[in-house]
């Protein structure tokens, strides 16, 4: 049972890690796109 619990814990930890990564990506990517568009706008000007 201990091995079983450890396996479940590993699965849960991986699952949470992936969710956090996805959340961070969804928050960071739009900001990066905004900053990149601002940078290109400054370069053209």
From Swiss-Prot:
It is a single-pass type III membrane protein. Transports viral genome to neighboring plant cells directly through plasmosdesmata, without any budding. The movement protein allows efficient cell to cell propagation, by bypassing the host cell wall barrier. Two movement proteins, p6, Hsp70h and three structural proteins, CP, CPm, and P64 are essential for cell-cell movement. Also plays a role in virion formation. Together with CPm and p64, encapsidates the 5'-terminal portion of the viral genome. Keywords: Host endoplasmic reticulum, Host membrane, Membrane, Transmembrane, Transmembrane helix. Its main location: host cell. The chain crosses the membrane at residues 8-28. It is found in: Host rough endoplasmic reticulum membrane. Signal peptide: none annotated. This is Movement protein p5. GO terms for cellular component: host cell rough endoplasmic reticulum membrane; membrane.
